[in-house]
Amino acid sequence: NPAVVNYTTAVFNFRKPFFLFTFVAMSQKWIYKPEPDEEIVDGLISSIGFGTLESKILVLREIDNYQKAREFFKPNGTDIHNPFLMADMQKAVERIATAIENGEKILVYGDYDVDGTTAVALMYLYLSKIVDKKYLDFYIPDRNVEGYGISDEGIHFAKDNGFSLIIALDCGIKSVDKIDLANSVGVDFIICDHHLPGDKLPKAVAVLDPKRKDCRYPYKELSGCGVGFKLCQGLNTIYKIPESELFELTDLLAISIASDIVAMTGENRVLAKQGLKFLRKTRKFGLRLLIPEEKLAHFEISNIVFDIAPKINAAGRISHAKASVELMISDNLKQAHQIVNEIVNLNDERREMDINITQSALNQVLELEKVERYSTIVYDPSWNKGVIGIVASRLIENYYKPTLVFTEGNNGEMVASARSVADFDIHKALEFCSDLFMKFGGHQAAAGLSMEKDKFEEFKVRFEEYVKMNIQEHQKEPSIYIDSVVKPEDLNREFFNFHRKLAPFGPHNMKPVLVLKNVKVNGYVRLMGKENTHLKFNILQPTTGRNIECVGFRFGQFAEDFKAKTFDLAFTIEENHWKGNVSHFLNIRDVKFHN
């Protein structure tokens, strides 16, 4: 789905980037979504009372009748499905109940990214309400020592410390050999994952994953933390903590949904919306300290992506993600302050590392681009494993090709993060080469792998050949999908109110991209940023005589063109909150100048 990649771009464009180097301004292909059926639009206008523009935007999202509109704007809980529809849920609940009854020690285990650490925090906090903490602990693998997923070290930690049950979150679906090891030493596993399964499922007590072929759970796009939340719901049919306390944990789930860029539809959208409400009034000290006080009342998905996720991720990227979990579960304000200071410093270190490695990778790509290629593959053994995924995304912003960034692992193997373009399935491309890997996993848009060094040259040839044979024309250049052409007078209070109701935004429920044609700047063009990288200007709203502010991040190089020419403007709408007042501005996504 192109929305996945476009979402990343839209979020990144929303704020000033911190890079010292300059990205090439890449032109985008404008794809106008087909005009929806007039009869359906008219039917929606008469049934829900929105205007023509608003109704068109809804129909383009397949919200094409009163019932769907009601479910979208006022969900009644039917989208939060029965957890026992998920394969193995009953087994998982019964095994945990047995462990609690018998006084067994339970270890909550998770990946080191935001989805994994929020999942561990959520599960730990739920279990701590029903289990004495002396029977409970959590474990996050060290990215630099153990790598991704379930590790030998984690299993031996459990065995050596008397844990007979591990609940694994956001990992484990392909850990067949590791679960066999755990079984051989008497440690049971419950797996809660959302990644694509392999041909063979691990022999765990229970494997919860809505993407299992034999799973009849109706919603397939849960995050790893989301699968963990479903297990908590299942457990709560026995332990019955107040529902308000259970759903208070959705503040962590909202962070997971936003950070892992899963679909913002159905159950995810309902849970994200619920989670944002709890996040704005969260009682978790660590989260309160991460959120600027002035933003708290209006905290949205984009704020999670910018203000929380990078900091939570920084611990796992640069040091150890255990700090992120401790931050989210801490009930000690002094401890929470100390951890926040630590991860803010780690995030600053991560930013500096990101800048340097991205520049180094860009230098490599300049050499690679001398020969026509359909993919980008770069390698340097000195690059930090924790930031190569970010670097891959940066390279795509410049060169827009399926991209892998390799570095060296702890045991001399090569490890990589892969990122894709548009709807090109990079997981499938890697599957084509999987006989070369030690292990790999991921999604359509992003994946990771490890590989012996002597396989690298063959991999580059085979991956390039696969991309060349399978990539489609529309996947070779960045595209912007436009909902509607509008006039300045359409951008009024009623439309802004409607726009707010569409939130939370994310893949499959993107902010509408609109186009104004034949626009002229009204007054000045002001450059912004230390390097004059960004700009802002006004256009006139003729019916009110007021100006509408337009902001262009990384459009500073076009300041003279904006001053002198008419242009077509593709944009999304953003909100500013300041001292109780709300204003709106147009966030420029692309521009076409008229000669």
Q: Which residues are covered by each model-predicted region?
A:
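Short alpha-helices
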Residues: L122, K200-I241, L246-A258
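Histidine/acidic-residue-rich, glycine-tolerant segments that coordinate divalent metal ions
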Residues: L169-L222
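Accessory interdomain/linker segments of ATP-dependent helicases and helicase-like nucleic-acid enzymes
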Residues: V486-I548
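Beta-strand/loop nucleic-acid-binding surfaces
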Residues: G545-E560
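OB-fold/S1-family single-stranded nucleic acid-binding modules
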Residues: K579-N595
